[in-house]
Amino acid sequence: MREMFLGEFIKNRRMELGLTQEQLCEGICEPITISRLENGKQTPSRNRINALLQRLGLPGDRYYALLSKNEKEVAALRKEIRADEIRLRRALERDQTEIRERMMKNLEQLEAIAEADDQITQQGILRSRAFLDDQSPEEQLEMLLRAIKLTVPRFALETIDRGLYSLDETTLINGIASVYDQMGEVRVAAEIYRQLLKYVESHDRDLAELAGHFCLVAHNYAITLERGKRYEESVELAQRGWQVCVEYGHYQLLPGFLSIMAECYWILGEEARARDLYYQAYYVYKAVRDEKNAVRVQKELKDHLNLEIHV
């Protein structure tokens, strides 16, 4: 395999996409930093390099970088906070307090060591605070919009699919759509997801490496379509998500796609299909230790089809 300097790698991909240095680096660093990187004269922080690679539709595991002690601590805390966000979504109510307290402690440590000009880390802190603190949906939305504009200053809901985003930024936009959904603005949420999915599908060149990225957006979009009573579209998208999960071995959201299809088929009157999918969703949720959603599916199966799962 041919070795290539990181700057050359980034320059080639940038030119392939027809992007200027200014377009690529907006909100992340100055154009002069990109110029120096492409000429091999400077290497920005790992946070910024990862964001640039992701905006180019490239994974960040194709290069190695020496980390300072601060960068290493920041990366470790951010990783643990993200892991706890997943644990919190899966946890039963009785287990959530411990996870929240640990997340708050890690967030406070991260805030203490994060550099003021590290927009990427500051953005992550603001996003986590929006969902962790006791905020109304309106307050959450304000915080998330403030967070996305730290690195995408010209962000606008009407032109999402024309932007250029890192994985963190697409996760943020996904969160913005989720809050609109919670507020009852289903059409707004669906339009955000539609644009975001279009962006992900057109920009992520290697689905095998970024399957989780596609599945996250597709999963939440399918839920919003169902809430908007667009059941056939929801099933179609959930089936695509299911196929991607199986084909690329990304199973975190697999039971979610199964349960979305189950409920839609039940609403559409296809009870046999719904029953089979509910059972599959339940046992996959149990296998990945997602007790919260396993209980939810168990209840839906009883409420909708008067069937019980004996464990």
List each language-model region with its residue ranges.
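DNA major-groove recognition helix of helix-turn-helix/homeodomain DNA-binding modules
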Residues: 47-63
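A short, Lys/Arg-rich alpha-helix, primarily the initiator
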Residues: 1-16
